[in-house]
Swiss-Prot record:
Positions of region (Required for nuclear localization and apoptosis-inducing activity): 1-74
InterPro entries documented for this protein: Myb_DNA-bind_5
Upper lineage: Eukaryota, Metazoa, Chordata, Craniata, Vertebrata
UniProt keyword annotations, A-Z: Apoptosis, Nucleus
GO term, biological process aspect, one: homologous chromosome pairing at meiosis
Organism: Gallus gallus (Chicken)
A cellular-component GO term for this protein: central element
Gly residues composition-biased segments: 95-108
Task of the protein: Induces apoptosis.
Any Pfam family the entry gives: Myb_DNA-bind_5
Places the protein is found: Nucleus
Protein name in UniProt: Nuclear apoptosis-inducing factor 1
Annotated stretches, region: Disordered: 92-117, 147-175, 309-330
Family under the similarity heading: Belongs to the NAIF1 family.
Length: 330
């Protein structure tokens, strides 16, 4: 007995493209008061479902294959999971870095106890936007002893200098501060950058004040990084929204231009039809004139024929003859 045919293998869909992910994040930023948990208190389920269907419609407008609503929700869940995992790594590494600085670990900054350099965890701009939507701590990068990794990515000439408290016995030894060093401080929300300084030598005469100042410079609050990253994310979001509006305006103008061209073509067609009508009227008038000229002689001949066939009136009788006839009759 033959076995039943195996069901056809389900064709695997393509991964979400960057444009699809960007549309999902943009729509969630636009409708965060409907779809994000810590914003949508009291929002009815019908409004949430309508917002998700709008997102699905926009994704399918640019997707190469048809997407279903569970796929879009699953993609958003995966994006949130990835961002939260990176944020957890950042926090854990920062706590570990703080303990190593306070405890004066044997390893150098930016290195694990085994001697291997820890790779920084960097959030992409898209992940930073998702992080802002989720309400997580806004962190550009994880420095294992180097908090300026994200800034160095943006500007290689800017470097963040970190200092630790040195032992009293070691503070007497001169230590040079390398040139091309970046300082940034939080004073009333103002970030100051000072680059390409000359090397500074810390001597034993005034080590305590210098090291205390350097420690204050190095121990920057998380609020500064959060504020910088949040401002960057907002600017990027506004720029993308502006670009989207510009594209929509351009599409609207193109549609208007197409409509005007159609109107012009219809007017040209109407003008051609009117011109053909005028030419036809002129031809008809010419034909009627020729017909009238042909019929005139025929009408004249017909009149003559009628006149020739009509009997002439009788001649008037003589009055004498008329009187004789009257007498005979009497």
């Amino acid at each position: 007995m033959a076995s039943p045919p195996a069901p056809p293998a389900k064709k695997r869909k393509m991964n979400f493209s960057e444009r699809e992910v960007e549309i999902i994040v943009e729509e969630l930023e636009r409708g965060k008061h409907l779809l994000i948990n810590h914003f949508n208190a009291g929002v009815p389920l019908a409004a949430k479902a309508a917002a998700w269907h709008d997102i699905l419609r926009r994704v399918n407008a640019v997707a190469t294959c048809h997407r279903e609503l569970p796929e879009v929700k699953k993609k958003w869940s995966d994006l949130k999971t990835e961002v939260r995992r990176k944020v957890a790594q950042v926090r854990a590494a920062m706590e570990g870095g703080g303990e190593s600085q306070n405890g004066g670990g044997a390893g150098t900054e930016g290195e694990d106890p085994t001697g291997a350099t820890a790779a920084p965890v960097i959030l992409t701009p898209m992940q930073q936007r998702i992080c802002n939507l989720l309400g997580e701590a806004t962190i550009i990068s994880l420095p294992s002893g180097d908090c300026g990794a994200g800034r160095r990515d943006r500007d290689p000439h800017h470097r963040l200098r970190h200092h630790r408290h040195a032992d009293p016995g070691v503070s007497a030894a001169p230590s040079e501060v390398p040139a091309e060093t970046t300082y940034h401080s939080l004073e009333d929300g103002v970030v100051e950058y000072c680059t390409t300084e000359a090397p500074t030598t810390v001597t034993a005469e005034a080590p305590l004040e210098m090291m205390a100042h350097q420690h204050e410079v190095s121990a920057k609050p998380q609020e500064l990084k959060s504020r910088i990253a949040l401002n960057s994310a907002k600017l990027l979001q506004e720029q993308r929204v502006t670009n989207l509006h510009v594209k929509e305006i351009a599409q609207h103008l193109e549609q208007q231009n197409d409509l005007l061209q159609m109107i012009r073509r219809s007017q040209e067609v109407q003008a051609c039809a009117q011109e053909r009508q005028a030419q036809a009227m002129e031809g008809t008038q010419a034909a009627l004139s020729a017909l009238i000229q042909v019929l005139r002689p025929m009408i004249k001949d017909f009149r003559r024929f009628l006149q020739s066939n009509t009997p002439s009136p009788s001649v008037t009788a003589d009055p004498n003859q008329t009187g004789q006839q009257d007498g005979i009759i009497q």
